[in-house]
A protein has these predicted regions:
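S-adenosyl-L-methionine
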Residues: 1-223
Length: 223
């Protein structure tokens, strides 16, 4: 069930916020992106099963659509995040759409263009369901995620649009994750899991409220 947490928009935004970067690429490391990411260990079996089921469904569909299109992760997610592909319309002049059409035409044993589009739309639907399941696991159902295409300010200006949660939801989620990180850290200190000599937690590493610098002060700025 941890897979659903780590594939969620919550974790993606957390990793971009607190992970280190090289140019505009994230350096995804356990210490910066996983060890600091707060996941409750006291989830009910019902919630764990829900997370496991949606995580498996998402993983399996992604694997099958990639195999059917004969595309790797990067190109698949380029399509996933392309606002030229929606349930209402397809912009057949968009470079991602044109590239997909040409690829499917020249590559043997692939699915049709329409099937590929439906597969991408289904992947988005599953991602929304996974985010909602993670939201429920945290008990933050007062937050409206409002999935759609939004600009994210940690990417280059010419490539900022992503299919993700609303900027207001992102800001609130990051705020609560930071608070939860601190709460878990304090609980670990009380349980003797904090190594004072090394000043790091043996389980969940604490992260501080960000000041000016990479990512900006997300909690006090409109995004």
């Amino acid at each position: 069930w941890e897979y659903a947490f780590l594939q969620s928009s919550f974790h993606s935004h957390w990793a971009w916020k607190y992970g280190s970067t090289m140019k505009f690429d994230i350096r995804y490391t356990n210490r910066d992106c996983i060890d600091t990411f707060p996941i409750s260990e006291s989830l009910s079996s019902e919630i764990q099963n829900s997370l496991e089921n949606i995580g498996e469904a998402y993983h399996e569909h992604r694997k099958q659509i990639m195999l059917a299109m004969q595309l790797g992760l990067t190109k698949t997610y380029n399509l996933f995040h392309s606002n030229a592909i929606t349930a209402q319309s397809i912009n057949d002049k968009d470079k991602q759409v044109v590239s997909l059409q040409k690829h499917l035409e020249k590559t043997a044993n692939t699915i049709s263009f329409d099937e590929a589009i439906q597969g991408i739309l289904k992947l988005r639907e599953l991602h929304v369901q996974m985010d909602e399941a993670v939201l429920d696991a945290y008990g933050w159902n007062d937050i409206e995620l409002k999935h759609d295409f939004y600009e994210v300010d940690y990417l280059p200006e010419n490539d900022r649009v992503r299919f993700t949660i609303h900027p207001d939801a992102r800001k609130e989620v990051l705020k609560r994750l930071l608070e939860l990180n601190h709460k878990i850290h304090e609980e670990e200190k009380a349980d003797g899991l904090f190594d004072k000599k090394k000043t790091v937690s043996k389980k969940v590493n604490i992260v501080n409220e960000p000041q000016a610098g990479y990512g900006g002060n997300l909690f006090n700025q409109e995004n």
